[in-house]
C-alpha cells in the first residue's frame, strides 16, 4: 500500500538527488520505492478498468436482453 511516508520519502529523495545527490543506498531505495509505487498504481488502474469493463459488459447484456 502506498503510504504518506512512502510519498514523502520519494519526494525527499527526489529533491536530495537534485540538490546534493544520492548515495548508492539512497539510489537503490529510490528505485525500490518508485517500483513499488508504479506497481501499485498499475494494479489500481487495472482493477478500476476491470470493474468498468465488467459493469459495461453487464449493462450491455442487460440492455440487449430487454430488446427481445
Swiss-Prot record:
Location within or outside the cell: Cytoplasm
Keyword Cytoplasm (UniProt): yes
Signal peptide: none
One Pfam family this sequence matches: DUF896
GO cellular component: cytoplasm
InterPro entries recorded: DUF896
Keywords: Cytoplasm
Annotated PANTHER family: UPF0291 PROTEIN CBO2609/CLC_2481, UPF0291 PROTEIN YNZC
Family: Belongs to the UPF0291 family.
Protein name, UniProt field: UPF0291 protein TTE2340
Organism, scientific name: Caldanaerobacter subterraneus subsp. tengcongensis (strain DSM 15242 / JCM 11007 / NBRC 100824 / MB4)
